[in-house]
């Protein structure tokens, strides 16, 4: 994502500009101007935000468009047929609940461009067996992988400093966790 200077002058203007820079929330304006791909996945007009997969989304494998920078909150929420997703290196943010209840999702590689894993990002992805967390990630959010019942092992890279509350709670198959010395904060019921 390119650097952008935001001046704090008018509070309304400031909030609007901050939303454009870093927000993973979908706005009414985003939806009004959205474009839809052949699989009924909506993107912002400029292609930088993946907004939402439609309720009729039934793909087993999906490749996020190159140039996408943000996978918004709830983007693939409850897409029960999704088994595999390819995320390009252009993505810097994965929003809250982005893959919430994607019960068929089996594996995911998070690109080196992502710096944090948001709250509930992969909550209850019950078929998720493997996750690759890159060295760019510094924090793992609350409930990020909670109820990923098939997850067997996880290696947390040296870049991570905090693991949120319930991040890996109810991961019943989890047998091995490697936590580096860089982690200074582990939330309640993290494992």
Segments predicted by a language model, with ranges:
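Structural signature of tandem-repeat unit edges
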Residues: 1-48, 54-70, 80-93, 103-116, ...
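Consensus positions within tandem repeat domains that build extended binding/scaffold surfaces
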Residues: 72-75, 95-98, 118-123, 141-146, ...
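Homeobox/homeodomain signature
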Residues: 40, 52-54, 58, 98, ...
């Amino acid at each position: 994502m390119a650097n952008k200077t935001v001046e704090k002058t008018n509070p309304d203007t400031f909030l609007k500009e901050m939303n454009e820079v870093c927000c993973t929330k979908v706005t009414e304006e985003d939806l009004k101007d959205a474009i839809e791909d052949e699989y009924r996945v909506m993107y912002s007009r400029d292609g930088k935000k993946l907004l939402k997969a439609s309720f009729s989304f039934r793909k087993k494998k999906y490749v996020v468009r190159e140039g996408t920078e943000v996978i918004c909150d709830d983007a693939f929420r409850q897409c029960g047929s999704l088994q595999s997703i390819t995320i390009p290196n252009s993505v810097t943010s994965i929003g809250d609940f982005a893959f919430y209840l994607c019960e068929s999702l089996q594996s995911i590689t998070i690109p080196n461009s992502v710096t944090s894993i948001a709250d509930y990002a992969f909550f209850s992805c019950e078929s998720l067996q493997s996750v690759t967390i890159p060295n760019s990630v510094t924090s793992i959010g609350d409930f990020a992988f909670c109820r990923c019942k098939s997850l067997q092992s996880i290696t947390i890279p040296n870049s991570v400093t905090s693991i949120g509350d319930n991040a890996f709670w109810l991961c019943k198959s989890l047998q091995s966790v490697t936590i580096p010395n860089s982690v200074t904060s582990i939330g309640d019921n993290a494992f």
